[in-house]
Design a protein with these regions (language model features):
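Short histidine-centered beta-strand/loop micro-motifs
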Residues: 13-16, 33-39, 55-57, 75-77, ...
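A short, N-terminal "cap"/entry segment at the start of jelly-roll beta-barrel domains
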Residues: 1-24, 29, 34, 100-101
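Short acidic-glycine-tyrosine-enriched beta hairpin
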Residues: 55-74
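Short, conserved beta-strand element in jelly-roll/cupin
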Residues: 27, 37-53
Length: 101
């Protein structure tokens, strides 16, 4: 597993797939990821535990957030948080900082 990612087109992986990648992500309160976007992949985030802010909107346990290709988002953990993230398709190097141009 690499930083929580366990399904995808990378090693090590429990299921090699170009169609999807899946990860269980753990964040500590205050963790922050800069605004970024994916040109190809759709990213689905399910909040399992905790509370986060993405693009100025707060989400909590049970919420599911869908970020479409070329839609930028930042991420801040407002509490210790566990999320499950699914990206479709699995495209390596498809993360770009800032807004889509």
């Amino acid at each position: 597993m690499i930083r929580g990612w366990f399904v995808g087109n990378f090693e090590p992986s429990v299921l090699k797939s170009k169609d999807v990648e899946v990860g269980v992500k753990e964040y500590q309160k205050g963790d922050y990821e800069q605004k970024h976007h994916h040109k190809i992949a759709t990213e689905i985030t399910a909040i399992i535990r905790g509370r986060v802010k993405m693009n100025g909107v707060e989400y909590q346990k049970g919420d599911i957030i869908v970020i479409e290709p070329n839609e930028a988002s930042d991420f801040e953990a407002l509490e210790d948080t566990i999320s499950v993230v699914v990206k479709m398709p699995c495209v390596l190097d498809d993360k770009y900082l800032g807004e889509a141009k």
